């Protein structure tokens, strides 16, 4: 049958070419038209494959060459060619070979006064010009001159032909040669004039497509440097800017405004950033490295512009896909285990990091109380591992009880009650019940200072609530000589009064201890100040915050404002009000501009420029010893007025996209709010967008290549109080000093009879800061051989975090993990009794301290140094890897290794793991995969977390091994230590668009009122610190269930877990009944039933005395 159809079509096409009978030709054209008018494009492609294009073109040439040409045949022929040509990518080449190109051009010239005939010719020329090379050929043959005869000033006649002519001209101008020809012949001015004329007369917007066609011509010309120069010389920026200002809100004008925006952005002159140098404002002399002169920015003429277009996109193009050509396909590299990168005898030094393997219970007891409140030994050679004496164990007496009470209160509800159900952790605002205050029961003695920590830095503030001068609240660091002065005692009294008057108790935080710790934190430029939020502390807000709904056109408005600066420079103040590169001070307290400051721990703001009265351009600092990685920001701002929107434009961001385009907001901390009892980082800002700007890096900095692009993050903030002091940050800050304070408070809070908690110094960093290593497990029940044997043979779990300083969310997740592991939660107790946790909570302290986003003080990404780290340049990575080597060498490789990270391009929380087979399958390298033996247990933990953790999603997890990730912790620990469950856990800076956190507060209120079901595709909730800490605790729960599902799980642990689950089942059932009775959040009810299925699974396995089967 197919052969008959093919032969029938071929007969028709052959007859069409060979027949000279008009009626036969018209009949065949009608039949072909009917065949192609129904069905899918497959019919057109089929006809093309059988020579349909050639047949139509040949008929066109033959008919056109008859005298006179028969337009009864030519018009339907042109219509068919227009339809077929849209699907035939080679139509232009075929037309050239069969001389149809010239024939059509001749026919168009002959029909300038015949509207319908000309229109059909233009349709054919449009498809021929779809090929750039054919468009160039048409330009050589005078097509553009012809088209300019068709495109006239505003008229209501022959508008179809004029529209078609603009479309053909736009296609021709894709050719660079045609573009240059248009510039040389002055067509840029002509096109601008035509557009102005049509715009001014077409008040009803009836001919928007003609105006768009004219603009497309200009856009293609502007792709050339000469075209942009001609456009600017013809005042094109001013003309297009003014013609669009009155129609920005008109939806019918969207096609025009979109192209105008592209042209204006394309023609905006590129310029260097307003910085002295592209290098960081801070420099650190790296041992053994020669310091080079940082490259300085060059004048504008040094900048190349690639002329790329950028459309105002609102679609989420998060970079979740791995390029197949980056996948590792070498089976030997994937499956082989490299040798040690250091002498084997060197691993012995890490025994001091595993004292739990050698302590007897008597030795451990004798150590308790030793070195009370002593400082960690400071080592002159920071590349050597400290001796065992530097360990800090359970060394605090029971009278330090307040922190324990904080912890007990915070975890009195078991973690099992907060799994992926309609849990209380989605804290929604309510006037009747604002939610349980986790901080009311914290006793005031949590702020008590030890006598050894009397050297308290200076906080200056008025303690009177009615006479606040909050801009005077600052926290300078103090030298040792000054700290003993009378002034210090006076300041301490002020601090005490201020804290007693205003402080809201923050669990696991002590301002006095923080200030004492801050004095011992070493920074590159020796910061003299501390940020108020870090000293005062942070409490999670009582309610969650939904993702910001982005209003249509926000980005467009901000770009037009950028363009206004160029064409109306008199409106721009352009005053530098803060700069790390300029002499201090630049700001006058009496001036009416905002005051900025960032020279404190983790702070990052390099320069602030006042653009307009309430608008500022900001530039963030590059990483120390680097010219890159501008993303993290954290700075103080004061001198504001309330109820006025201030616009901030961070103009030197590097990433091509950001979650700020998809619902994310920066964070804000108000000092006045904190003194009113709300010490909280909140998401803030409106009119947020992220887009490419006109700044470029110079070719000198880029090493001779075309300079990279920069992007602008813009947002507006309406401050809650006038003359407040506020802090703005990319994400919730978490400093190194906060970590060291937190660890000490945790150490004081543990129950010495139950929890084995020890701090070691893994090493000293390049900057001279100790990198902490924490060990957590359960104390042995007694000093009997049996109990000590069980204590020493517990499997290890290794968790690390914050290798990238800007990923502060990783530290909040780690905070949740640490607090949960030392808590009295029954799940935490089971975990301590069955595992030893080795935790390195901050792998890059120097980067965190100095406000870096990605690198250490050496200017290197430490998570790309795991293959062969240097003890001198990357000490934390070198010794972290050494510790893992040591555990592997004694047969104690961790069950799970996980490195906590933050992700700037995707939502939710997810894991990256490693799999040989999945990598090869994805790369389509299936040869030999059948012989590769690989366990599938690497998928078990992600599946567990997907069922338990509200923020986690399995759909974003990946187990591919990329070449570009070969030197990361995840891949190196997997390959070299043989840890099959080696992961990177990524937490979004933004929030969740799945699971319980998918529902926004506004929708929940509507659902409750209307008894409606939530709809899919919601924006979801932004992460707060509460949700991040919860994820850290849920990760721990996942480790327990992973062990329960393993074939090696002991019957004793199964029995303990069954008892625990039975105790929790009643509470979960009551919670489920409440949800059912209120008909609230049906999805969450499903999650609750799902959790009951999990618990029943473990109980059945216990009753049947069968170990659970590994998840496949």
Swiss-Prot record:
Cellular component per GO, a single term: microtubule cytoskeleton
Subcellular localization(s) per the UniProt record: Cytoplasm, Cytosol
Name of the gene: AGBL1
Region of interest called Disordered, as start-end residue ranges on this chain: 291-345
Peptidase M14 domain residues: 732-1022
Zinc found in the keyword field: yes
Protein name: Cytosolic carboxypeptidase 4
EC annotation from Swiss-Prot or TrEMBL: 3.4.17.-, 3.4.17.24
Main location group: cytoplasm
Subunit structure: Interacts with MYLK. Interacts with TCF4.
Effect of residue 1036 to S: In FECD8; decreased TCF4-binding
GO molecular function: metallocarboxypeptidase activity; tubulin binding; zinc ion binding
Keyword match Protease: yes
GO biological process: C-terminal protein deglutamylation; protein side chain deglutamylation; proteolysis
Coiled-coil zones: none
Annotated catalysed reactions: (L-glutamyl)(n+1)-gamma-L-glutamyl-L-glutamyl-[protein] + H2O = (L-glutamyl)(n)-gamma-L-glutamyl-L-glutamyl-[protein] + L-glutamate; C-terminal L-alpha-aminoacyl-L-glutamyl-L-glutamyl-[tubulin] + H2O = C-terminal L-alpha-aminoacyl-L-glutamyl-[tubulin] + L-glutamate
Pfam families: Pepdidase_M14_N, Peptidase_M14
Superkingdom field: Eukaryota
Binding site for Zn(2+): 804, 807, 901
